[in-house]
């Protein structure tokens, strides 16, 4: 059994709803891998769920799936951001919530770009997408860490 057989058997048969649920589950699982919840095994499972959801999807839909994964992840891992805006930024409830939402929207774009790249690479050769995943993920993390310092 080669990668193409697995790809055809698994990825091509998922409905839109299943793909959306996989992306959401991926974001929740990734959040659960971090110290607040401390289930480190999910750190390996979460990206795999997103990859399975993205392979075989169109690039725009893959972008949405990645964004959904990022939004779920950041919503669960940085809720303290809202508190900081309220207590130290002295923002009213609605404005602090809006800033929190904007942060989630912006940071989730990196996950969306990751998913779109993997969908593009995997369109004709899923095995290449699987090989590209670590490089694209590390590139995404590097960009997230250094983007504010680039300008």
What are the roles of these predicted feature ranges?
Residues 6-151:
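Membrane-embedded alpha-helical bundles of multi-pass enzymes
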């Amino acid at each position: 059994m080669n990668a193409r057989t697995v790809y055809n058997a698994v990825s091509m048969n998922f409905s839109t709803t299943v793909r959306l649920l996989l992306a959401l589950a991926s974001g929740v699982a990734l959040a659960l891998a971090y110290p607040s919840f401390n289930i480190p095994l999910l750190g390996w499972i979460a990206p795999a769920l997103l990859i399975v959801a993205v392979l075989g999807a169109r690039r725009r839909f893959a972008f949405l799936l990645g964004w959904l994964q990022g939004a779920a992840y950041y919503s669960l891992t940085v809720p303290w951001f809202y508190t900081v805006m309220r207590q130290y930024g002295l923002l009213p409830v609605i404005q602090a919530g809006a800033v929190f939402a904007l942060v989630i929207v912006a940071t989730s774009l990196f996950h969306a770009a990751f998913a779109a790249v993997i969908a593009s690479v995997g369109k004709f050769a899923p095995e290449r997408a699987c090989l590209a995943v670590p490089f694209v993920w590390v590139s995404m993390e590097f960009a997230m860490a250094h983007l504010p310092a680039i300008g």
